[in-house]
Amino acid sequence: MANGANALKVRGFQTVCSDQQRSLIERTPEGLYCRAAKAWVDPWRPVPRALITHAHADHARPGCGEYWAVASSEGVLRQRLGKDITLHPVAYGEEHWLGQCKVSFHSAGHVLGSAQIRLESEGEVWVVSGDYKRDDDPSCEPFEPVRCDVLITEATFGMPIYRWQSGEQVAKDIHAWWSGDRSRPSLLFCYA
């Protein structure tokens, strides 16, 4: 790392910022915290205000005071976290002021209701990608490129050793498996 640079390390990944650039997002024991919004993005522990990138269990955890997420993820979030959670469903691109920060959610193309979270304060724009997918997927809105000064990106399967079949090929394989023996019930497990 160059002299005069600070790094925000997040579970093995880092974002490098110049000394002149303040950190809009910082790592805390609860997760990624935006002090200007008084909110955590996909917190690891219960917090007063959570901004949720999508409804999968590794991003949306129970016990938070309030949740902000894309409206199309509401059903899954309430099923997983409880029907009585305090949830603020938002539309893609809709801007909300939380504290001293303008917050908006933009499609990540990962699953239904998945979002990148854009945070803007004092002329700086940071984006937390959450999980994202750039391939076409009829089950969700396509990935939306979002201009920013700093991008904090998920990279779980970003290494070159991971190569995936196209969604179309996976669908064909599932159909072939299912139609291979129609006399038997078929049960397909998936992660949510």
Enumerate the language-model features and the residues they cover.
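His/Asp/Glu-rich metal-coordinating catalytic cores
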Residues: 17-45, 49, 55-191
